[in-house]
A protein has these predicted regions:
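Flexible loop/hinge segments at secondary-structure junctions
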Residues: 1-335
Length: 335
């Protein structure tokens, strides 16, 4: 089977090597086509949500005796709920995450993919499966002033993204090792404003409005680490939401706005959004697409997406066939 279902909801499918690794994690279980009659509960990352929903719909068509419920809530919710951390909600069988586990949430066993919960029910373990690759997309309104601006520049650098999104002053960025003359060659020296014209004289004299996920999101955390380098000042004020559609609407409603979210939501809105090319580690401006996300050239914003299965014999009777169905069968891959 192909990778059409993964691609159809806006993700990039695993490489052959990654698929082989995931298959080895299922080894010895010889999953049947459908698990025993019952239910599967899934919650977590809003980025993984479209894929989880697509797999659930397809699996229930093939296995009508299985009921699959899917909720969002963010990666922290996915980690917490599969570990039965009541502060994050009711326990689930599968926790979705668009980031890796934190050392405060779980400890990794020697095999590398089973994790012991450290918060919630500490007798619980979770098995981590990579299900797709995401290219975190930095977007502006297609054809708008910001689009024209960045197009003329060829793209943006990670340091420019840090200046745009961070609450750090120019002096603090300089102390952190950034060259402000390269970031804002037309800078106005005013830390209270962040204008497109500071990036290039040909760009509009308009304040850069921000749209980004809330702090419970793995997407927020990934960008915070990869672009802001966990700067203690955090993000500048902007439109924050756990609903990616709110972020899309914010960006499409303001030519001077810039936002970021998972590749799936960019793919859903290609008619109204442009994803900015970002300078990678080789010095090339690269936009996210199926090829650049998969081969890693869209760095530093390519990242793995995960589903984490509760390690419990009765639960795994249903969740392992579901995972095998999603990752390896024609029906799961080619809706």
């Amino acid at each position: 089977g192909g990778d059409l279902l993964v691609n159809s909801v806006g993700y990039v499918a695993l490489t052959a090597e990654q698929q082989t690794e995931m298959e080895s994690r299922l080894a010895g279980e010889a999953p049947v086509a459908c698990g025993p009659a019952g239910s599967i509960s899934i919650a977590g990352s809003s980025t993984v949500l479209p894929l989880a929903e697509a797999w659930a719909e397809t699996y229930q068509e093939a296995c009508p005796d299985i009921s699959v419920t899917v909720e969002s809530g963010g990666s922290s919710s996915g980690a917490g709920r599969v570990c039965a951390n009541s502060a994050k909600g009711t326990p689930v069988d599968i926790g979705d995450m668009s980031r890796d586990w934190k050392a405060t949430e779980a400890s990794r066993q020697a095999n590398g993919f089973v994790l012991d919960c450290l918060v919630g029910d500490t007798t619980r373990d979770a098995a981590q499966f990579q299900v797709a690759i995401d290219g975190l997309s930095v977007v502006v309104k297609k054809g708008g002033a910001a689009d024209t601006c960045v197009s003329g520049m060829g793209g943006v650098t990670p340091d420019q993204l840090r200046w745009m999104f961070s609450a750090e002053t120019a002096a603090e960025l300089t102390t952190a090792g950034l060259d402000m003359s390269e970031i804002t060659p037309n800078g106005d020296g005013n830390d209270a404003t962040h204008k497109w014209s500071e990036l290039d004289a040909s760009c509009p004299d308009a304040e850069i409005a921000l749209a980004y996920p809330d702090a419970a999101s793995g997407t927020y955390e990934y960008f915070f680490e990869a672009v802001l380098h966990e700067a203690e000042q955090g993000f500048r004020a902007g439109q924050q939401s756990s609903d990616d559609n709110v972020l899309v609407n914010t960006v499409t409603g303001d030519e001077a706005a810039v936002g970021y979210f998972g590749y799936a939501y960019y793919q859903e809105n290609l008619a109204t959004l442009t994803a900015l090319p970002v300078k990678n580690s080789d010095g090339n401006f690269v936009a996210p697409d199926a090829t650049t996300v998969r081969d890693g050239s869209y760095n530093p914003l390519s990242r793995p997406l995960f589903m984490n299965l509760l390690v419990d014999a009765s639960t795994l009777e249903d969740t392992l066939p579901f995972m095998h169905f999603g990752l390896f069968t024609d029906a799961g891959q080619a809706k």
